[in-house]
Amino acid sequence: MTTQTMTAVSGNDGDTGADVDAGARKPGGPLLALDGITVTFPGVRALDAVSLSVRAGEVHGLMGENGAGKSTLLKVLSGVNQPQAGTLALNGTAQRFASTRAALEAGIAIIYQELHLVPELTVAENLMLGQLPSRLGVVDERTLAARALDALERLGEHIDPGIPVKYLSIGQRQMIEIGKALMRDARVIAFDEPTSSLSARETTQLFRIIRALRAEGRAIIYVTHRMEEVYELCDRVTVFRDGRRIDTFDSVTDLDRDRLIGCMVGRSIEDVYGYRPRTAGDVLIEAKGLAGPGLSEPVSFTARRGEIVGFFGLVGAGRSELMKLLYGAARPSAGHVELNGKRVAFGSPRDAVRAGLALCPEDRKQEGIVAIASVADNLNISARRHFSPARMLLDARRERELAQRYIERLAIKTRDGDTPIGALSGGNQQKVVLARWLAERIDVFLMDEPTRGIDVGARAEIYNLFYELAEAGRTVILVSSDLAEVIGVSDRIIVMKEGRIAGEVAKAQATPDALIKLALPR
């Protein structure tokens, strides 16, 4: 890779590429062209005669539900899957990749959601993996370090190239993956849900790099579930459904959100949220002057039986911290919680669950599931205490029956209860977490960002579960950063900012402007 190319990517002072306005760019012709690509597996047509072009100098978004065909398309581009029909062309030249190495050598790189780095190797070794500089058959450590350091500096990353990758943050590891692609001078770079584990600062840095890559004339494919990212970053967007390309929108500037959702799921946005009004009952949970970590002022609120109460706010507003105080995962410094009019004090989450209150945490993969365990084991983690009075022996038969009952009831897409939960989609993992608490006869469900990273179709199923819970007289507290979601699903919305409650908005008055005005700092 040339120094000029790496300089343009850095986004540092003097770089004119990082902040190029979309209107000032002039994307070239198709750098990548797919025509009639078909991929079949036993009993499944994963891609059905898909045609797609990606231009030089554009960010092309790919959207669709899980199973729509996006991942299979990336595997075709990377040489993992070979199509049974159709053609792939780079710069007008037909290509057929028998391996990932062949795709890389042709100039196509994929940055997967699960990063493909070797944790025990150094940053420099990962950057140059497969093309380590050598002298007389021995790795030239000095040249290796110099090239790696140059690449990191020009990417704007100040990382010691000699440290093992396992010590880096997710955002830093992602930059190493991008660096690997640039070291091979990839002209087509595909990103698969790249912000799913990034902080706001890391996301901003990633977007700056992607804009710089676009300004250099590279073709960027951007797979995401997050509509706000499509509107912020992409030039065009293509929607997949059931293995087919449904539509390509040549401009996202005036693209109607409802139309985009309709293309993805085959139904209207009203059907996605499917709001079902209810009559609320008596107060089920009440916080009175609750104070503690993450809160700047004492917090008081009520939630009734049959209600879905939304909590909206910006990052750092204190919503997740409040949920942990309610759940017994953090100790309040003042105030208390009442359930059914009775004062309760939880010394631990276990106490909260016994009292009928449960939390589905924001970080589902780290705090909500045991990824290496089976669906059945994850579902039964809490219910096991009911199976054996002595709590010494597990009732395997009852566990299997319980797991199968909730797999069927919640339409969890899995082969069986023995399937590792890590193999399931995000939406189905969330259903397992919900099923765990349904088995515990929970009355108050604290749902912290429950649909983050979940496709639109799976969201509709989860919303339907919320409505069923509320109609059964339970209470759902929905913490969400998605304006459309919190407005579409909630009966009323409490807005937090800077560790305190800023106001409450009724369903009839809930608009994006009303919520944002309350949520913004002074």
Curated annotation (Swiss-Prot):
Quaternary structure, from the entry: The complex is composed of two ATP-binding proteins (AraG), two transmembrane proteins (AraH) and a solute-binding protein (AraF).
Biased composition range(s): Low complexity: 11-21
Keywords: ATP-binding, Cell inner membrane, Cell membrane, Membrane, Nucleotide-binding, Repeat, Sugar transport, Translocase, Transport
Homology family: Belongs to the ABC transporter superfamily. Arabinose importer (TC 3.A.1.2.2) family.
Sequence ranges of Polar residues compositional bias: 1-10
Cellular localisation: Cell inner membrane
One of the record's GO molecular function terms: ATP hydrolysis activity
Name of the protein in question: Arabinose import ATP-binding protein AraG 2
Binding site for ATP: 64-71
Chief location of this protein within or outside the cell: membrane
